[in-house]
């Protein structure tokens, strides 16, 4: 069951990346508006972006809760995705099903808390803060953990204070974290808006 749960977490992070990039942001089309297979979700998400750019990362929709159409859309979308994938994974692995349900709830918790407590977001999920407040909003697609942003080369760091302790986005002993970061930077290097100066 644990192997299935861990595999489900990896699949959920990959889905988070794909859904954020292709459904919530939509794909560029020359001379036309962006395309999303779920246009209402894209509309909701771009309104979310406009809101947080105006309010220094805070989203009042989460304060309003269920009565806010964007919050309601996010909750319903997560429930549908969790229901569909949980049902599909159940015959294969109950651990994967459990991880899908956990991941949907965790995504909502992390995303909501980040936009209610911007200082917490800067410390705990700087990749998502970078996604909204960086000059390039078409990068840093992961919300809960930056795994697939590193794997797919879309982690763009705007400043040293917005660089996570390590690419797993998990608190680890400093020695382990440093070794992991060094290895990942060799294999899957993050991009920088402006490369940090090396102090000799």
Language model region names:
Residues 2-6, 96-98:
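Hydrophobic alpha-helical transmembrane segments
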Residues 9:
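Extended basic (Lys/Arg/His-rich) segments that typically form rRNA-contacting surfaces
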Residues 12-173, 179-189:
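Membrane-embedded catalytic scaffold of the fatty acid hydroxylase/desaturase
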Residues 191-200:
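Soluble, non-transmembrane catalytic domains of enzymes that act on hydrophobic metabolites at membranes
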């Amino acid at each position: 069951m644990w192997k299935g749960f861990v595999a489900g977490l990896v699949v959920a992070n990959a889905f988070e990346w794909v859904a954020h990039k292709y459904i919530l942001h939509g794909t560029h089309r020359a001379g036309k508006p962006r395309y999303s297979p779920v246009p209402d979700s894209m509309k909701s998400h771009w309104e979310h972006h406009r809101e947080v750019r105006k309010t220094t990362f805070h989203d009042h929709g989460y304060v309003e809760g269920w009565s806010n159409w964007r919050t309601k859309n996010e909750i319903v979308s997560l429930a549908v995705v969790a229901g569909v994938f949980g049902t599909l994974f159940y015959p294969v692995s109950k651990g994967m099903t459990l991880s899908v349900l956990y991941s949907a709830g965790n995504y909502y918790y992390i995303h909501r808390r980040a936009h209610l407590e911007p200082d917490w977001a800067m410390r705990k999920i700087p990749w998502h803060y970078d996604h909204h407040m960086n000059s390039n909003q078409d990068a840093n697609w992961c919300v809960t953990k930056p795994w697939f942003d590193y794997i797919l080369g879309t982690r763009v760091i705007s400043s040293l204070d917005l660089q996570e302790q390590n690419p797993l986005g998990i608190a680890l002993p400093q020695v382990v974290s440093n070794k992991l970061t060094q290895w990942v930077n060799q294999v899957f290097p993050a991009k920088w808006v402006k490369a940090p100066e090396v102090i000799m």
